[in-house]
Every structure is written in C-alpha cells, then in structure tokens.
Design a protein with these regions (language model features):
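DNA breakage-rejoining catalytic core of tyrosine-based enzymes
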Residues: 1-13, 74-82, 98-101
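C-terminal catalytic core of Y-nucleophile DNA break-rejoin enzymes
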Residues: 70-89, 101-124
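Conserved tyrosine-mediated DNA breakage-rejoining catalytic core shared by Y-recombinases
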Residues: 47-75, 84
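Catalytic phosphate/metal-binding cores of nucleic-acid and nucleotide-processing enzymes, i.e., regions
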Residues: 48-50, 74-75, 112, 152, ...
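Catalytic-site neighborhood detector that most strongly recognizes the C-terminal catalytic loop/helix
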Residues: 67-69, 164-189
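Active-site-proximal segment of tyrosine recombinases
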Residues: 44-46, 136-137, 147, 155-166, ...
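Basic, Lys/Arg- and aromatic-enriched nucleic-acid-binding interface segment
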Residues: 10-42
Length: 192
C-alpha cells in the first residue's frame, strides 16, 4: 500500500475546494470540506445521511456528528464547525427531495446509495493532479491534512491522537508526516 501525504499548503487546500465549487460539483465540494473538517475516514464519511447532521424537527444542524467508526468500532463525537455547516447548506439547498434517510453523498446509481470509496478516491486524485498539488494525494490525505494542519496550529499530538482514535502516539506521528521543512521551521523560529 502506498503512503499518502497530507496537503501541507493552505492555498492548495483552498484551491482543491474551489475546484469543485467552480465546476458546480457541490457534492464533491461538500465531501472534501467535511473530510478536511471532521477527520473522518472516507468510508465513515460516505455513509453519512442527512439525519446524522441535521435535525429535521428543529430545522437546524446538529452540534455534533455521533458516529461509530467502521474500522475501530469506537463511538466518536465530532463537532460540526461553521465551514462544515456552510458546505452542507450549499448541498442541502441544491438537493431535491431531501429527507432524513437520504445519503449526503448520493451516487447517481441506485435510489439512495452513497458513492463508493473508489469513486471518491478517483474524484480527489484527479482533482489533485489537475491542480498540480504536490504529494501522493488521496481520500486519506484529507484525514491526514486535518491532523497536520491542527499540529501546525499548535494542537498537541496527544489531542490529535485522541481525535483520530489512534492506539499510540507513534501512529499519530506517522500521520502528521513531519518532514525536514517542518523541523527546519522550528529551528528558524527559536532564536533564543
């Protein structure tokens, strides 16, 4: 299995999101935005239904997504931040016949099935290639990007480990993909 990289440059993150917006691909825009802002694995993300994020009785977004992760079987609570909610709103306003059990990332094939992981992979991989984003970029890159960008903002690795539901700090450190440029930046900023 090849190693995937996080998207290190914030400009590249924005270009990836804008790529789908400009093309009017709101499902793909929302998929990327939610993946970047929730740290969910793509398999868990694609299974989301509108009732997981939206309270139809109160007509408002839920504060958190409560999900049992497919890989770890652990229950996790993820806050829906404003960026995630805004992307969901764009898609919600565009979606015809919205009902609670409707898949958020609905495939054109079948009545109410999500796109599959390989389709999501191809969507993200192709966009990264078209945009010239450096690294081996895939669906898992979006999860890694969350951790990398959180770490760059000063979030302690132990907290990122907890968010990821990792069993060890070593796994989280590998996810962060810290490279020589990151190490050099620490030395440049010390100036003691």
């Amino acid at each position: 299995m090849s190693r995937t990289d996080p998207i290190r440059d914030k400009g590249d993150i924005q270009r990836l999101k804008n790529h789908f917006l400009k093309k009017g691909e709101l499902r793909n825009y929302t998929m990327v935005t939610l993946a970047l802002n929730t740290s969910l694995r793509i398999g868990d993300l694609l299974q989301l239904k509108w009732e997981d994020v939206y309270n139809f009785r109160n007509n408002q977004y839920k504060a958190h997504i409560a999900i049992q992760e497919q890989k770890t079987h652990k229950l996790t609570m993820i806050l829906l931040n404003p960026e995630a909610k805004d992307s969901l709103t764009l898609l919600k306003n565009y979606t015809e016949g919205l009902f609670p059990e409707l898949c958020i990332f609905k495939s054109r094939i079948g009545k109410n099935r999500p796109i599959n992981r390989s389709r999501a992979f191809n969507i993200i991989k192709q966009a990264a290639i078209e945009l010239g984003i450096e690294g081996n970029i895939s669906c898992h890159s979006l999860r890694k990007t969350f951790g990398y960008q959180a770490w760059k903002k000063g979030v302690p690795p132990a907290l990122i480990m907890s968010i990821y539901n990792h069993s060890s700090l070593e796994i989280t450190k590998r996810y962060l993909s810290i490279d020589q440029d990151d190490k050099d930046e620490v030395f440049l900023n010390m100036n003691l």
